[in-house]
């Protein structure tokens, strides 16, 4: 599937990319090859393949939540450049 330069420019604009003419040509070729590959994938007969949500069976691999001790508030604030009433003080970034 051939992609046009206008389509590449549109994709670049949506991606907030500024491309020169050489780059547009490169992306035009690369995107065309990608779309050709996808077309080949669409030709594969998958009628005998059972639908799955994942290609490998996964189990819950999360660990249990366990409460563990941590450093104290004073220890955490020890190296803070600025603090107020046992809280970190950071520069204001929103007016």
UniProtKB/Swiss-Prot annotation:
The keyword Glycosyltransferase does not apply. The keyword Cell membrane does not apply. Its EC number is 6.3.5.-. GO terms for biological process: glutaminyl-tRNAGln biosynthesis via transamidation; regulation of translational fidelity; translation. Keywords: ATP-binding, Ligase, Nucleotide-binding, Protein biosynthesis. SUPFAM superfamilies: Glu-tRNAGln amidotransferase C subunit (SSF141000). It catalyses: L-glutamyl-tRNA(Gln) + L-glutamine + ATP + H2O = L-glutaminyl-tRNA(Gln) + L-glutamate + ADP + phosphate + H(+); L-aspartyl-tRNA(Asn) + L-glutamine + ATP + H2O = L-asparaginyl-tRNA(Asn) + L-glutamate + ADP + phosphate + 2 H(+). One of its GO terms (molecular function) is asparaginyl-tRNA synthase (glutamine-hydrolyzing) activity. Heterotrimer of A, B and C subunits. Belongs to the GatC family. This is Aspartyl/glutamyl-tRNA(Asn/Gln) amidotransferase subunit C. It comes from Thermodesulfovibrio yellowstonii (strain ATCC 51303 / DSM 11347 / YP87). The gene is gatC.
């Amino acid at each position: 599937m051939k992609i046009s330069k206008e389509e590449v420019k549109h994709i670049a604009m949506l991606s907030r990319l500024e491309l020169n003419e050489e780059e547009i040509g490169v992306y035009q070729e690369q995107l065309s090859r990608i779309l050709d590959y996808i077309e080949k994938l669409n030709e594969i007969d998958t009628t005998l393949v059972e639908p799955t949500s994942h290609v490998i069976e996964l189990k819950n691999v999360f660990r249990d939540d366990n409460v563990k001790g941590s450093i104290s508030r004073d220890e955490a604030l020890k190296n803070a450049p600025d603090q107020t009433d046992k809280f970190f003080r950071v520069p204001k970034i929103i007016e």
